[in-house]
From Swiss-Prot:
InterPro entries found in the cross-reference section: Ribosomal_uL18_bac-type, Ribosomal_uL18_bac/euk
NCBIfam families hit by this protein: L18_bact (TIGR00060)
Quaternary structure annotation from Swiss-Prot or TrEMBL: Part of the 50S ribosomal subunit; part of the 5S rRNA/L5/L18/L25 subcomplex. Contacts the 5S and 23S rRNAs.
Annotated protein name in UniProt: Large ribosomal subunit protein uL18
GO molecular function: 5S rRNA binding; structural constituent of ribosome
Annotated Pfam families: Ribosomal_L18p (PF00861)
Family: Belongs to the universal ribosomal protein uL18 family.
Function of the protein: This is one of the proteins that bind and probably mediate the attachment of the 5S RNA into the large ribosomal subunit, where it forms part of the central protuberance.
Keywords for this protein: Ribonucleoprotein, Ribosomal protein, RNA-binding, rRNA-binding
Cellular component annotations (GO), alphabetically ordered: cytosolic large ribosomal subunit
GO BP terms in the entry: translation
Organism of provenance: Synechococcus sp. (strain JA-2-3B'a(2-13)) (Cyanobacteria bacterium Yellowstone B-Prime)
């Protein structure tokens, strides 16, 4: 029987999480992509604490998605820019990137590149 896409994504995410670990000096930028929305969090895994977050559900960003929708690369880029600005305000400039088991393509790639352009280093 063929392995489902969900199972392969979960396996890939477990494999990535074994290698990617966020600290206070260099937290983890975790990305979760659903069919409609995209979420990004800057996480300190040692303290198990979310330092900054942004998503397409944020009230500040919600008005910008009225024409384009939330499941687009433009929306992902806005979320990436927003989470990078929030992290930089907290004094975080270097992170490790956790793509959440998804391929580095499309919305995940757009979010990562926008976060880099906004000043995060990874």
């Amino acid at each position: 029987m063929k392995t489902s896409r969900k199972i392969t994504t979960q396996r890939r995410h477990r494999r990535i999480r074994r290698k990617v670990f966020g600290t206070a000096e260099r937290p983890r930028l975790a990305v979760f992509r659903s069919h409609r929305h995209i979420y990004a969090q800057v996480i300190d895994d040692v303290a198990q604490h979310t330092l900054a977050s942004a998503s397409t559900l944020d009230r500040e960003l919600r008005e910008k998605f009225k024409e384009t929708g939330t499941a687009t690369q433009e929306a992902a880029a806005l979320v990436g820019r927003s989470v990078a600005e929030r992290a930089l305000q907290m004094g975080i400039s270097r992170v490790v990137f956790d793509r959440g088991g998804k391929l580095y393509h499309g919305r995940v790639q757009a979010l990562a590149e926008a976060a880099r352009e906004a000043g995060l280093q990874f």
